[in-house]
């Protein structure tokens, strides 16, 4: 049995890839149970399943009832915020709030919400700004921390966070890939910073990650996305490998499909760059995460 303890703060377990479906086509049999088992074997004790919009938040919540280790978030991703307008913003917000406050044993955060100016083709900037701000209503009403997203929108993100910081108990900016100055601004707001494969692509990314105090770090996979690729600066620091096939085979990972078990690889890169003991770092991160999302739960 492993000595490591992990909470994967961002895992997209509602994604069809974990059921063998890629781009709408069934490519292999449903291996969801195997994916979860591999994660448990490396020490993942809790999985926080990301809600990307109202429908996805409902699906994530439904999934949480299948295992005691599963929890979820409720919110609307910046690229999907046009749904507020499409369905009526008051009604949409009310539905998100109902889902949040009526499932307090399983919903641990408001999100995924924030700003994504890299993908404005999915949702205009003005719409993203309006409905990121609105989702602080959810955080304030529920008393839950926030699971936050920021891509190429640091200035606007920080501005909204500063104006609304007192309305939420705390939060984590997940999949962080910003500069050292960006990280410092988030730390000044007493936010946590989530690290996954997308946070470890370049030498600069590694230096930024190294600069973040360990008591402000969290860890995630964002699977099936954001895996550590061979071209990433951190890849050479990975010690743990998993049997992987290009074509699916039972008992194996699938090439290019990130899994929650790969959280151990994220830790290995982080610990090597920071020159810290992996077990000590994992324990610090586990406690950070437990404090934000689970400490005050009944």
Curated annotation (Swiss-Prot):
* The keyword Nucleus appears for this protein: yes
Q: What cofactor is this protein dependent on?
A: a divalent metal cation
BP-aspect Gene Ontology terms: DNA replication; eye development; retina layer formation
The record, for InterPro entries, names: Metal_Hydrolase (IPR032466), TatD-like (IPR001130), TatD-type_Hydrolase (IPR050891)
What family does the entry list?
Belongs to the metallo-dependent hydrolases superfamily. TatD-type hydrolase family.
Any keyword DNA damage? Answer: no
Q: Could you say which enzyme class this protein belongs to?
A: hydrolase
The organism of origin for this protein: Danio rerio (Zebrafish)
Q: Which SUPFAM superfamilies does its entry note?
A: Metallo-dependent hydrolases (SSF51556)
Its subcellular locations are: Nucleus
Chief place of localization: nucleus
One function term, GO molecular function aspect: deoxyribonuclease I activity
**Cofactor binding, per record:** Binds 2 divalent metal cations per subunit.
Write out the residues that bind a divalent metal cation 2. 112, 149, 174
Q: What's in the keyword line of the UniProt record?
A: Hydrolase, Metal-binding, Nuclease, Nucleus
UniProt name for this protein: Deoxyribonuclease TATDN1
EC number per UniProt:
3.1.21.-
Any one cellular-component term (Gene Ontology): nucleus
Which PANTHER family did the record assign? DEOXYRIBONUCLEASE TATDN1, TATD FAMILY DEOXYRIBONUCLEASE
Q: Where does a divalent metal cation 1 bind?
A: 112, 222
- Entries under Gene3D superfamilies matching the protein: Metal-dependent hydrolases
> What does this gene product do?
Deoxyribonuclease which catalyzes (in vitro) the decatenation of kinetoplast DNA, which are circular DNA catenated to each other, producing linear DNA molecules. Plays an important role in chromosomal segregation and cell cycle progression during eye development probably via its DNA decatenation activity.
């Amino acid at each position: 049995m492993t000595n490591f303890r992990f909470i994967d703060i961002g895992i997209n377990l509602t994604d069809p890839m974990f059921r063998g479906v890629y781009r709408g086509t069934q490519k292999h049999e449903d291996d969801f149970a195997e994916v979860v088992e591999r994660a448990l074997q490396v020490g993942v004790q809790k999985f926080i399943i990301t809600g990307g919009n109202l429908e996805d938040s409902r699906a994530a919540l439904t999934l949480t009832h299948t295992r005691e280790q599963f929890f979820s978030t409720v919110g609307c991703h910046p690229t999907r915020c046009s749904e507020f307008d499409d369905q009526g913003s008051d009604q949409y917000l009310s539905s998100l709030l109902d889902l949040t406050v009526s499932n307090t044993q399983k919903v641990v955060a408001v999100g995924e919400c924030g700003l994504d100016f890299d993908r404005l083709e999915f949702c205009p900037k003005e719409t993203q700004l309006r409905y990121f701000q609105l989702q602080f209503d959810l955080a304030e009403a529920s008393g839950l921390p926030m699971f936050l997203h920021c891509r190429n929108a640091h200035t606007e993100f920080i501005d909204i966070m500063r104006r609304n910081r007192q309305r939420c108990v705390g939060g984590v900016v997940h999949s962080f890939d910003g500069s050292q100055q960006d990280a410092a601004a988030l730390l000044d707001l007493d936010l946590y910073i989530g690290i996954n494969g997308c946070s470890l692509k370049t030498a600069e990314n590694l230096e930024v990650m190294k600069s973040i105090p360990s008591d402000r770090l969290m860890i995630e996979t964002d699977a099936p996305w954001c895996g550590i690729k061979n071209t990433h600066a951190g890849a050479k620091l990975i010690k743990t490998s998993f049997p992987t096939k290009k074509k699916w085979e039972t008992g194996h990972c699938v090439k290019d499909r990130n899994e929650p078990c790969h959280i151990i690889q994220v830790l290995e890169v982080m610990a090597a760059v920071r020159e810290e003991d992996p077990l000590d770092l994992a324990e610090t991160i586990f406690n950070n995460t437990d404090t934000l999302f689970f400490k005050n739960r009944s």
